[in-house]
Amino acid sequence: MLYHGVDLVEVRRIRQAVMRYGQRFLARVYTAAERADCEIAPQVMRYEALAARWAAKEACAKALGIGLRGLGAFTVDYPRAGLHDIEVVRDAAGRPTLHLSGVAAQTANALQIRALAVSLSHTDELAIASVVAWVDLSGV
């Protein structure tokens, strides 16, 4: 069985948040590893990289069927992951991968998710992420 989540982000919204709130916004949304990874991107592509990671966090939350804490003033009755609970990191080959902790990891374990795949892409204006979660039902 597969679960899928996709999210599209306007790069300008991330750029505006960084310009307005600076390090406070970056530290709230991105882990230290994510911030460091985006810092090595050329300045012109930094906002695209940040937007793609934001989209990945949202897409992963959608694939898991959970929300993200801190993204609005609405109340929900299901678990919500913190923004740092879903981390976009690179593997040894440079491919983006997801590292889950907290509510995100607990939910993935409860759903018996065996693997996550993430794909990121962006233009100057938009960033998109797709997350596929694989559940092994062979033992069911």
Swiss-Prot record:
Which EC numbers characterise this protein's activity in its record? 2.7.8.7
Location of this chain's protein in the cell? Cytoplasm
**UniProt xrefs under Pfam families:** ACPS (PF01648)
Q: What does this protein do?
A: Transfers the 4'-phosphopantetheine moiety from coenzyme A to a Ser of acyl-carrier-protein.
Q: Which GO terms describe its biological process?
A: fatty acid biosynthetic process
* Keyword vocabulary terms for this entry: Cytoplasm, Fatty acid biosynthesis, Fatty acid metabolism, Lipid biosynthesis, Lipid metabolism, Magnesium, Metal-binding, Transferase
An MF annotation (GO) of this entry: magnesium ion binding
Query: What InterPro entries does this protein's entry cite?
Result: 4-PPantetheinyl_Trfase_dom (IPR008278), 4-PPantetheinyl_Trfase_dom_sf (IPR037143), ACPS (IPR002582), Ppantetheine-prot_Trfase_dom (IPR004568)
For this record, the Gene Ontology CC terms, alphabetical, are: cytoplasm
Tell me which family the UniProt entry assigns to this protein.
Belongs to the P-Pant transferase superfamily. AcpS family.
Give the residues the record marks as binding Mg(2+): 7, 58
**Gene3D superfamilies listed in its UniProt record:** 4'-phosphopantetheinyl transferase domain
Top-level taxon of origin: Bacteria
Q: What is this protein called?
A: Holo-[acyl-carrier-protein] synthase
Catalyses: apo-[ACP] + CoA = holo-[ACP] + adenosine 3',5'-bisphosphate + H(+)
Q: Which cofactor does it need?
A: Mg(2+)
